[in-house]
Amino acid sequence: LSWSALALTSAYPTGAPTSACFDMIPGHFASPQSEPAPYIITTPVSAVKAGDSIEVTISGKTAKDTMRGILLEARQGDKIVGTWTVKPNDNFSQLLNCGEPGNAVTHKHHANSEDKQTVSYLWTASGHLEGDVVFKVTIVKDYHTFWVAVPSAPVKILSHH
């Protein structure tokens, strides 16, 4: 019993567990914030062709709105779609397998680095994908302060034919 209690109370300093993939809720035993998130998710365009890539940026609205942890996914309805690219020198982020390799991004252990105010990743739409996609991110500011599945504006995926 004490081992399971210890395991359940861990703060996932090495990234979100795959058990968080669907509901995007961190296992912090605290309630998510009820006020709107002080973060925005932006893309340079509102439409992209299937098979193409788009940069997705998550930013705090002020310098105090930093991120200690994230879980980022692209969703079409409830389905996680597409794949992500994390820069090789990124000391904050890593890919997560939420049913498919590289279809989510999470934080990694970063004890010696600072929390981030802005992060960007490249997302690639699958070649067969069509319709609207929404980027959703769970953002952890600290153990007790987090927002779950903050949505972006929809991005339209156009047929590559």
From Swiss-Prot:
What pairs make up the disulfide bonds? 21-98
Q: Which Gene3D superfamilies match?
A: Reeler domain
Q: Which GO terms describe its cellular component?
A: extracellular region; membrane
Matches recorded under Pfam families: Reeler (PF02014)
Alphabetically list the UniProt keywords: Antibiotic, Antimicrobial, Disulfide bond, Glycoprotein, Immunity, Innate immunity, Secreted, Signal
Describe the location of the Reelin domain by residue ranges.
Answer: 12-161
| Protein's cellular compartments | Secreted
The cross-references to InterPro entries, in alphabetical order and at most eight, read: Ferric-chelate_Red/DefProt, Reeler_dom, Reeler_sf
| First and last residue of the signal peptide | 1-11
Biological process terms from the Gene Ontology for this record are: defense response to bacterium; defense response to protozoan; innate immune response
Q: What glycosylation sites does the entry record?
A: 91
Q: What is its main location?
A: secreted
Please state which protein family the record places this protein in: Belongs to the insect defense protein family.
Q: What does this protein do?
A: May have antimicrobial activity.
Name of protein: Putative defense protein 2
Native species of this protein?
A: Antheraea mylitta (Tasar silkworm)
**Top-level taxonomy:** Eukaryota, Metazoa, Ecdysozoa, Arthropoda, Hexapoda
